[in-house]
């Protein structure tokens, strides 16, 4: 499948899905990718790639001169990300690694321009610390969080380690759903998008 648009936000229904594997929804994905500020040729790391929605869209943004690494601890997620990358024709500039962060990060002999951390890991402080070691100066990090504890832990870790220009945005999306008498707006869970830079 080809995505011929220059903006992120591939509709969720175009991705192959598995109910057991989380996915960054299209509106949140578009905002997270805009906070990453990806450029052609960038090297991007997606920690907790899940369905591969961020991995795929980041790959479209970096182009053939860039590379996107997707990491997940679940083999099913790695396989699903691979299938979605094949579906959108971007498998050629994606590297998929099965492993759990933060431990797996020290085995990657690369530096990254952009790092995305999805979901809510209990090890968020350790993941952020390990990310500091592999992100280039001027690189951006973006974290999606659902839990307030994740937000608190992420912000305190980012400040302590030295990330600058920290921002946090709370996003509440409601999608229209047809009912017998009209359209009702169904709210999704609030998501916090945290971003910062390595000086």
Swiss-Prot record:
Biological process according to GO: anaerobic cobalamin biosynthetic process; methylation
Protein residues bound to S-adenosyl-L-methionine: 24, 48-52, 72, 101
Keywords, in A-Z order: Cobalamin biosynthesis, Methyltransferase, S-adenosyl-L-methionine, Transferase
UniProt pathway annotation: Cofactor biosynthesis; adenosylcobalamin biosynthesis; cob(II)yrinate a,c-diamide from sirohydrochlorin (anaerobic route): step 8/10
Matches recorded under CDD domains: AdoMet_MTases
Reaction it catalyzes: Co-precorrin-6B + S-adenosyl-L-methionine = Co-precorrin-7 + S-adenosyl-L-homocysteine + CO2
EC annotation from Swiss-Prot or TrEMBL: 2.1.1.196
Key word S-adenosyl-L-methionine present: yes
GO molecular function (one): protein methyltransferase activity
InterPro entries: CbiT, Cbl_synth_MTase_CbiT, Cobalamin_biosynth_MTase, Methyltranfer_dom, SAM-dependent_MTases_sf
EC top class, as a word: transferase
Pfam families recorded: Methyltransf_31
Source taxon at top rank: Archaea
HAMAP family given in the database record: CbiT
Annotated NCBIfam families: CbiT, PRK00377.1
Family of the protein in this entry: Belongs to the methyltransferase superfamily. Archaeal-type CbiT family.
UniProt-recorded name of the protein: Probable cobalt-precorrin-6B C(15)-methyltransferase (decarboxylating)
Organism: Saccharolobus solfataricus (strain ATCC 35092 / DSM 1617 / JCM 11322 / P2)
Name of the gene encoding the protein in the UniProt record: cbiT
């Amino acid at each position: 499948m080809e995505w011929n648009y220059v903006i992120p936000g591939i509709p969720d229904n175009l991705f192959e899905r598995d109910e057991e594997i989380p996915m960054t929804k299209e509106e949140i994905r578009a905002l997270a990718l805009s906070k990453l500020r990806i450029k052609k040729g960038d090297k991007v790391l997606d920690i907790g790639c899940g369905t591969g929605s961020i991995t795929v869209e980041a790959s479209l943004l970096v182009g053939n001169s860039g590379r996107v690494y997707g990491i997940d601890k679940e083999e099913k997620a790695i396989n699903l990300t691979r299938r979605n990358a094949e579906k959108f024709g971007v498998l050629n500039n994606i590297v998929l690694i099965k492993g759990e962060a933060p431990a797996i990060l020290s085995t990657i002999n690369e530096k990254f321009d952009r790092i995305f951390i999805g979901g809510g890991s209990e090890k968020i402080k350790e993941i952020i610390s390990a990310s500091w070691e592999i992100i280039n100066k001027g690189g951006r990090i973006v974290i999606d969080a659902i839990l307030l504890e994740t937000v608190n832990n992420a912000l305190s870790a980012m400040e302590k380690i030295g990330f600058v220009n920290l921002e946090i945005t709370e996003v509440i999306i409601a999608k229209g759903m047809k009912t017998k008498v009209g359209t009702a707006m169904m709210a999704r869970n609030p998501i916090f998008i945290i971003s910062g830079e390595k000086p």
